[in-house]
Amino acid sequence: MLDLCITGGRVVLPSGVEETDVGIQAGKIARIGPINKKEARCIMNANGQYVFPGAVDTHVHFSEPGRTEWEGFFTGSRSLAAGGTTTYVEMPLNALPATTNRANLQRKLEAAKGQNYVDYSFYGGLVPTNLHELADLSASGVVAFKCFLSPCGSDIPGDFRNVDLNGLRAGMRLLAEKGQLLCVHAEDPSMISQLEAKLLSPVGADAYVASRPVEAEVKAVCDTLAAARETGCRIHFVHISSAAAIEAIERAKEEGVDVTVESCPHYFLLSAEELAELGPLAKCQPPLRPKQEQAKLWACLLDGQIDWLASDHSPCTPDLKDGDFLTAWGGISGCQNNIDIMFDAAVKRRGMPPEQLARLIATNPAKRMNLREKGEIAIGKDADFAFVDDRQSYTLTKEQLYYKNKHSPYVGRTIGCKVRRVLLRGQTIYTEEKGIIGKPSGELLHIH
């Protein structure tokens, strides 16, 4: 006897969209295909909506412990749940202390207990001072590691710091021995420092964008690829914003380098031309690119050259968005709109097949992070689903946001679909009518 049968939906399978049934038992997908409704204890009618696999967001900053006024696991995971993301991997920075050793990871694990509405896991960090702790941190069960090439963090003890190329290579050698994946924020520090030194206060939107050019991203990507060839380390590039960087990564893939790449919805939905009007709310690193560059990035996405999409949800308190474009916090709050905003822009407006979007938001990140139970609608996988109604539009308001600090550059945007129901391991955790349902039931993944 099945616990639940989902019927009446357009199910987004790896092979394409099918109008079929999905049977769930003990939180797992047990059957796909026509089901006699007498074989299920409960029937859920999707009423013609798309049934997507729950999204897997591999790039969020929830800032806990240490900076919980910025977000926190409770509000951050509720935001993900409301948008159809059922699994996340949380970055090692913005929390204090950063996740750069076993003890700091343990503090994060304790802070996360009982707070999450979706399933979760964590990165470890590579910083200049923790090479001797990487093996122990790897054995603690982090799913991957993260480093910055450009300056980051602060002078506060325990905060995250960037590595130089020597530190990058040294860390790569150690991580390669463990078979670990290293995720890299790729912007060239020397190029950025030289350009920032020429900025005149107050720094406007155009000057800020010019201070972190595509060339800085491409150089850092190429330097990292060279280090990967030398060390054999598996690598992943986060939040890539330019087609030129994608082209360099594509060439490396053809040469056999073990590399993947993500981009973020804001690089497809927002442009440098809008930045002055949006203000520091839309400041991010790398910055938004001009529409001409954005069009090239869209071509890369539609052509399958980008492995997946992630939010890079990097929230802060409103006061940190005050000031000019140099001093304001660089980060966008966006994880609640992981699915709907890209379904509208990619599937409805540009004709991307829904199964391709499913690969971008769920299947590919789950595979790369070795989250074997996640990422696709297939027998044996966790019964994580997002129901997307493409027949309804809505305009996003601050009141609809579950973030601790209710600001986002997407507020005021009309989105041509709605996430109307979300299930985690077969249990409904969100509906459009009721909002978040029940108590936190998210589980820690992949820590051993």
Swiss-Prot record:
One Pfam family linked to the record: Amidohydro_1
Entries under InterPro entries matching the protein: Allantoinase, Allantoinase_bact, Amidohydro-rel, DHOase/Allantoinase_Hydrolase, Metal-dep_hydrolase_composite, Metal_Hydrolase
Pathway: Nitrogen metabolism; (S)-allantoin degradation; allantoate from (S)-allantoin: step 1/1
SUPFAM superfamilies: Composite domain of metallo-dependent hydrolases, Metallo-dependent hydrolases
Amino-acid positions noted as binding Zn(2+) 2 in the UniProt annotation, renumbered to this chain: 146, 185, 239
Keywords on record: Hydrolase, Metal-binding, Purine metabolism, Zinc
Enzyme Commission (EC) number: 3.5.2.5
Role this protein plays: Catalyzes the conversion of allantoin (5-ureidohydantoin) to allantoic acid by hydrolytic cleavage of the five-member hydantoin ring.
Subunit structure: Homotetramer.
Protein name: Allantoinase
Organism: Shouchella clausii (strain KSM-K16)
Gene that this sequence comes from: allB
